[in-house]
């Protein structure tokens, strides 16, 4: 099993698809990496040679992926919360950030319903 950027990529998949298992690499970026490394996108991971894997490792080093990317995204959210902007406050309150309605929808973001006692007559 090939290990790139700390991730074991699946052996039986085409390398073009297998690279997308790495956080921060989608299909477009996978094609870019394969072109840069000079590796055939139709080859299976199990058929890769050691020098091909090393070329792929070198090609992925120029991109922000995995832990570094997760850290960057976390810092961006923390920055929004620290400066107190609307987006940061919405993130902190676990509400939709991009202007969606919350009176009836947004169940995923708000969580399960909280039962409120009814009004006595």
UniProtKB/Swiss-Prot annotation:
InterPro entries: Rbsml_uS13_C (IPR027437), Ribosomal_uS13 (IPR001892), Ribosomal_uS13-like_H2TH (IPR010979), Ribosomal_uS13_bac-type (IPR019980), Ribosomal_uS13_CS (IPR018269)
Keywords: Ribonucleoprotein, Ribosomal protein, RNA-binding, rRNA-binding, tRNA-binding
Pfam families assigned to the protein according to its UniProt record, in alphabetical order: Ribosomal_S13 (PF00416)
Sequence segments annotated as region (Disordered): 97-121
Compositional bias (Basic residues): 100-121
Keyword tRNA-binding annotated: yes
Cellular component aspect of the GO annotation: cytosol; small ribosomal subunit
MF terms in GO: rRNA binding; structural constituent of ribosome; tRNA binding
GO biological process: translation
SUPFAM superfamilies per record: S13-like H2TH domain
Disulfide bonds: none
Keyword set includes RNA-binding: yes
Protein family (similarity comment): Belongs to the universal ribosomal protein uS13 family.
Chain's role: Located at the top of the head of the 30S subunit, it contacts several helices of the 16S rRNA. In the 70S ribosome it contacts the 23S rRNA (bridge B1a) and protein L5 of the 50S subunit (bridge B1b), connecting the 2 subunits; these bridges are implicated in subunit movement. Contacts the tRNAs in the A and P-sites.
Quaternary organization: Part of the 30S ribosomal subunit. Forms a loose heterodimer with protein S19. Forms two bridges to the 50S subunit in the 70S ribosome.
NCBIfam families: uS13_bact
Protein name: Small ribosomal subunit protein uS13
Gene: rpsM
């Amino acid at each position: 099993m090939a290990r790139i950027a700390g991730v074991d990529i699946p052996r039986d998949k085409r390398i073009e698809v297998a690279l997308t298992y790495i956080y921060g690499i989608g299909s477009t970026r996978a094609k870019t990496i394969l072109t840069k490394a000079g590796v055939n996108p139709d080859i299976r991971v199990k058929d890769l040679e050691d020098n091909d894997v090393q070329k792929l490792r070198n090609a992925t080093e120029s991109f922000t992926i995995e832990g570094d990317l997760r850290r960057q995204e976390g810092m961006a959210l923390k920055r929004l919360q620290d400066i107190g902007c609307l987006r940061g406050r919405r993130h902190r309150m676990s509400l939709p950030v991009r202007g969606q309605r919350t009176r009836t929808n947004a169940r995923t973001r708000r969580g399960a319903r909280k039962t409120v006692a009814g009004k006595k007559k």
